């Protein structure tokens, strides 16, 4: 993705390995944040090893060379092919600058490049900023999908995206 100006710096997004130390650090920060909000049975987290599988694409958002955000999409096929958005997380000091929107746009672009026209996700009800982001991007509520079961602390969402 082309670099964008953010505050007084250059922001860019690129594919990253979940095995990178800085990516693992953000995954750990995300885990710690979510552990404060939800009990273990309501935390549907992908490990670094899970994110390293061939059907997963992980992106990193960099501000002047420093990783400040991550996001991933897992390609799945059930009744239809879709991408499941996972691990969208921005460090606290960089929130509110549109970085998560940039990550989501690039994840969706990568889905369309692969002829995947549906994007799905699970998020928690105690994350109003995330819910607002996803709704603002056109995601709508839906029933649980894949291996997910109904959970009063989870919200399941979907968006139809244009395929190239």
Language-model region placement:
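Acetyl-CoA-dependent GNAT
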Residues: 11-86, 91-93, 104-106, 110, ...
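Short glycine-rich hinge loops at helix-strand junctions in the catalytic core
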Residues: 98, 115, 138
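Active-site acidic-Proline motif in GNAT/NAT acetyltransferases
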Residues: 91-93, 97, 125
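Conserved catalytic-core motifs of GNAT/GCN5-like acyltransferases
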Residues: 18, 42, 120-123, 131, ...
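Conserved GNAT acetyl-CoA-binding A-motif
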Residues: 104, 111-123
